[in-house]
């Protein structure tokens, strides 16, 4: 079961509900063969890595996981209403504070110009969120609690119970 894919999917679903002029897709498996179909541009969502905090537990491993997501904006223009700069503004507003599945709210890390080629302007926005990575353990078959007898300190012992000899 993937913990990362649901994060990407929930970001995609959220951006689709907030931005209507651009295609919003997961980063392609083969970027060299990617074809921009949308007349305005696209926002590509990519897992960019994770960092884990130090282990402090002595029994089960549980670590805070800081997940980095790259949002690549590809636009056919830079300055008009459908341009890269306008869409970057919309993406920032949509993503800051959004909580992907099983995560804390998203925060911005960095944004930079990635280049221009054949009239396509590219910017990359790095976003981070946090979740937990927890060790998977097998259930241990321990004896089950059968009966509980309650009493106050002043009550006599239950006759079913025998004191240790």
PLM features per residue range, with description:
Residues 55-64, 116-118:
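Short, solvent-exposed beta-strand/turn "edge" segments of beta-rich domains on protein surfaces
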Residues 49, 67-72, 94-98, 132-134, ...:
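Glycine-rich loops and low-complexity Gly/Arg-rich segments
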Residues 60-66, 74-93:
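Extracellular/virion structural assembly segments
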